[in-house]
Amino acid sequence: MKRSLLKTCSIIAGATIIFSSLSISRNPLEVQAASMRSASEIVQEMGVGWNLGNTLDAKITNLSYNTSPISFETGWGNPVTTKAMIDKIKNAGFKTIRIPTTWGEHLDGNNKLNEEWVKRVKEVVDYCIADDLYVILNTHHEGNWVIPTYAKESSVTPKLKTLWTQISEAFKDYDDHLIFETLNEPRLEGTPYEWTGGTSESRDVVNKYNAAALESIRKTGGNNLSRAVMMPTYAASGSSTTMNDFKVPDDKNVIASVHAYSPYFFAMDTSSNSVNTWGSSYDKYSLDVELDSYLNTFKSKGVPVVIGEFGSINKNNTSSRAELAEYYVTAAQKRGIPCVWWDNNYAETNKGETFGLLNRSTLNWYFSDIKDALIRGYKNVHPEATEDDKPSTDVTNPDSGNTKPDSGNTNPGTETTTPTDNEKISITSKINDWGGAYQADFTLKNNTSSDINNWSFKIKKNDIVFTNYWDVKITEENGYYVVTPQAWKTTILANSSIVISIQGTGKVISNFEYKFD
């Protein structure tokens, strides 16, 4: 996810933490490749998880290669990770820990990893393995060199493969509780395309980087021959464009990875459009539609999916945050999708990316109500973890209280181009029909040689009900939806296109009527 407050939201300065002296009883080398479970089997067991955020992923560019690992680990203000900290997560009922890890700062001029850094990462992984937790180990905050363009591909790929070869060798004998994740949110950082679905080129290169990392992992042998490997879409985005363009290598143990801080205006937004409450039938239905899009898209590609990051920030609205947390996890578990809460140990009210749940210095919970809600969400579907409690793919209709079976069919989309009265911009729409709900993807093409800023257009309502959107703001005016961009979508570069996605319910319209002011 976007981390604009990484250094400023460091917490608990001056706290003194001592390494735990607890022994680690589990042997992470005890499972051989022949007994490694499939990715699909593992996903069914991962449950609800927790991110050790802003810790091993602290990107400190002014520290030298030989700086002690602990200086990096605590560089953004978080305390040293201890076994007691991991025990706290385990005892709360979480089943998975994601360990975001930055490696680029620990490569020398020959792209060799610092052995002390590898040793420290293994130590933290071992804390988790000892507690029978699933562990997601990734490459995080590598965007300064993992740049998804054709121009950079030839230089990035060898370095990425060398990095993953070294990581894989270090962990090749760990059992199937360890899951690798090739990349975090690979994207065109600092460009208008960063959080808007990228370009066809960048999405293609992300697929190639994923495949290159997987190839390096498999070549190291041992348990890595069949280890579950997570792979993100472009920017780990759950938009229809990024998911549809996600390519799965010919490998039965791949897991798709998306990040879903949903709904955005409740979960992350701090602007004047922000909302502080959640829980209506409309809210729940919108989230169900979004989760169905993940399930159906990746099911059609033959892979399971994990939501590697989700959560909501502190706006002094704990009750609504807890309600969303429970519903989110329950709905995801019904669809067989594990969710991993992003925790950066920052919990102040109305201070930006305040996702913290556990105070890592005191080992007390900032928000025990939210923690309990997350675990309840899992237990709602798995009350006793019996055979009868396996996740289903039922879709809940919040208005009726009944469930309907997932048809398993996804309309790949019908595409139409509608002439507009604005020669500068043309619009193409593509409809992905899920049955009872749909997603409309609008491609806006700038037909001029100059950038277009602050665009807007109207869509005739025609009995349409739009329910969910992130990149735009929508108001109603004289029988039209008025669509205006969020700040990150205001510019359409010269001779370029952007894509916006709007989800809706009811009648599916194949030919929208557009109008420019």
Swiss-Prot record:
GO biological process: cellulose catabolic process
PROSITE patterns for the chain: CBM2, GLYCOSYL_HYDROL_F5
Gene Ontology annotations for the cellular component aspect, listed alphabetically: cell surface; extracellular region
Protein's name according to its UniProt entry: Endoglucanase A
Keyword line: Carbohydrate metabolism, Cellulose degradation, Glycosidase, Hydrolase, Polysaccharide degradation, Signal
Gene Ontology molecular function, alphabetical: beta-glucosidase activity; cellulase activity; polysaccharide binding
Gene: celA
Low complexity: compositionally biased ranges: 408-420
Organism: Clostridium longisporum
